[in-house]
Amino acid sequence: MSGGKGKAGSSEKASTSRSAKAGLTFPVGRVHRLLRKGNYAQRIGSGAPVYLTSVLEYLAAEILELAGNAARDNKKSRIIPRHLQLAIRNDEELNKLLGDVTIAQGGVLPNIHQSLLPAKKAKAGAASQEL
């Protein structure tokens, strides 16, 4: 009888996750489950969660890279919401994508309107041209 787990049926190999097959870190299975539970469509194709997961992973990596650069510029080793805000608002495409998103504790971009800045003094070489 070969009903139990014996050495005779050990030709089975360990299962490989869809995330590993696609070379992703984010969970494809979880995204697939959330797509099914979310009632976005009656049927979900097998490639849709892989594609969506890869897009989400790319966006997360892009934002985290820019936020890490902002943290390093501020001589910090930990990313805080302010760094996320600076990273997103200084990048044209991410700002367009996340323009209506409010980041808690993010603050605002430093910006002083030109009319509020002190007037520049005239150069000495351009003396008065009075007659």
UniProtKB/Swiss-Prot annotation:
Modified residues (N-acetylserine): S2
Phosphoserine: residues carrying this PTM: S128
Region (Disordered), start-end ranges: 1-22
Chain coiled-coil ranges: none
Gene Ontology terms describing biological process: DNA repair; heterochromatin formation
A cellular component term, taken from the record's GO annotations: nucleosome
UniProt PTM comment: Phosphorylated to form H2AS128ph (gamma-H2A) in response to DNA double-strand breaks (DSBs) generated by exogenous genotoxic agents and by stalled replication forks. Phosphorylation is dependent on the DNA damage checkpoint kinases MEC1/ATR and TEL1/ATM, spreads on either side of a detected DSB site and may mark the surrounding chromatin for recruitment of proteins required for DNA damage signaling and repair. Gamma-H2A is removed from the DNA prior to the strand invasion-primer extension step of the repair process and subsequently dephosphorylated.
Alphabetical UniProt keywords: Acetylation, Chromosome, DNA damage, DNA repair, DNA-binding, Methylation, Nucleosome core, Nucleus, Phosphoprotein
Chain span(s) of sequence motif [ST]-Q motif: 128-129
Entry keyword Acetylation: yes
Residues with the N6-acetyllysine modification: K5, K7
Cross-referenced SUPFAM superfamilies: Histone-fold (SSF47113)
Annotated compartments: Nucleus; Chromosome
One term of GO molecular function: DNA binding
Family: Belongs to the histone H2A family.
Quaternary organization: The nucleosome is a histone octamer containing two molecules each of H2A, H2B, H3 and H4 assembled in one H3-H4 heterotetramer and two H2A-H2B heterodimers. The octamer wraps approximately 147 bp of DNA.
Note, other: In contrast to vertebrates and insects, its C-terminus is not monoubiquitinated.
Biological role stated in the UniProt entry: Core component of nucleosome which plays a central role in DNA double strand break (DSB) repair. Nucleosomes wrap and compact DNA into chromatin, limiting DNA accessibility to the cellular machineries which require DNA as a template. Histones thereby play a central role in transcription regulation, DNA repair, DNA replication and chromosomal stability. DNA accessibility is regulated via a complex set of post-translational modifications of histones, also called histone code, and nucleosome remodeling.
Domain observations: The [ST]-Q motif constitutes a recognition sequence for kinases from the PI3/PI4-kinase family.
Name the UniProt record assigns to this protein: Histone H2A.2
Organism: Candida albicans (strain SC5314 / ATCC MYA-2876)
